Design a protein with these regions (language model features):
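A short helix-loop-beta-strand connector motif used in the catalytic cores of GNAT acetyltransferases and
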Residues: 57-72, 83
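Acyl-donor (CoA/ACP) binding surface of acyl/acetyltransferases
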Residues: 1-26, 30-36, 72-203
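Hydrophobic residues in alpha-helical segments
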Residues: 31, 41, 63-64
Length: 203
C-alpha cells in the first residue's frame, strides 16, 4: 500500500498539521484533561501537562514514518489548537476485528480515522470539516480502497459526523479502552468507489 504520512491540510476554517511538543499547553487545556471529551475514547484524561508533553514527544518520533497519520486541528482565526485527528490501523489494537469485515480487503489492515476536539468547539461543524478533509487526503494520496470508522453506541453524535463524510453503517462490534474496558461500537465503511461517486463532476 502506498502511504503519504502526515502532511499539512487546509480547509476554510482549519489547519491540520503535525502536533509538536510545544502544543502541550493548549492540548492539555483545551481537551486532553477533560473527562467529557475522553468519555467514549480509549484513553483517560491526562493527569497533568507533563503527561501531555510526554505523549507529544513520543508522537514526534513517529512522524518520519509514512504510515503514521496524526494531526493537530488548529483554528486559523485564533491559532488555537483545539483537537486532534488521526488515521490508524485498528487491527493492531483490535485483532478480532479481522473477522468483522467480510468482503473487505484486510491485507493492508483496517485503517480508521479517530478524532476528538475540545468542548468549546462542539456543535460548530469543526469535526465534520476536519474529517471531510482527511477523507479527501486519504483517497487522493494513498492507493487504499476503503476506510473504516467507528463510534461508541452511546455517542450517536459521532456517527452523524461520519455519515456526513460519506461513511455507511456496516455492523456493530466491541472495541476496548486501553485499560481493557469493553465499549459497544457501531462500525462504518467508506469505499473509494463510493467516495468517488459522491464527488464525481457529474454530481
Amino acid at each position: 500500500m502506498r502511504h503519504a504520512g502526515t502532511q499539512e491540510i487546509e480547509t476554510p476554517r482549519l489547519l491540520l498539521r503535525r502536533l509538536m511538543p510545544s502544543d502541550a499547553p493548549m492540548m492539555y487545556a483545551n481537551w486532553a484533561n477533560d473527562p467529557e471529551v475522553t468519555r467514549w475514547l480509549r484513553w483517560t484524561p491526562h493527569k497533568d501537562m507533563a503527561e501531555t508533553q510526554e505523549l507529544l514527544s513520543a508522537w514526534a518520533l513517529l512522524y518520519p514514518n509514512e504510515d503514521y497519520y496524526q494531526w493537530a486541528i488548529v483554528e486559523k482565526a485564533t491559532g488555537q489548537v483545539f483537537g486532534s485527528i488521526s488515521i490508524y490501523n485498528s487491527l493492531l489494537g483490535e485483532p478480532a476485528q479481522r473477522n468483522e469485515w467480510p468482503g473487505f480487503d484486510l491485507s493492508e489492515g483496517i485503517w480508521e480515522p479517530g478524532y476528538c476536539i475540545g468542548r468549546a468547539w462542539w456543535g460548530k461543524g469543526c469535526t465534520t470539516e476536519a474529517l471531510n478533509a482527511l477523507v479527501e487526503y486519504w483517497f487522493k494520496n494513498t492507493d487504499s480502497n476503503w476506510l473504516a470508522c467507528s463510534h461508541a453506541v452511546e455517542n450517536p453524535a459521532s456517527g452523524k459526523v461520519m455519515m456526513k463524510a460519506g461513511f455507511v453503517y456496516d455492523h456493530e462490534a466491541v472495541y476496548h479502552r486501553f485499560d481493557g474496558t469493553a465499549i459497544p461500537c457501531k462500525c462504518y465503511a467508506l469505499t473509494r468507489e463510493y467516495y468517488e461517486s459522491l464527488y464525481s463532476p457529474n454530481k
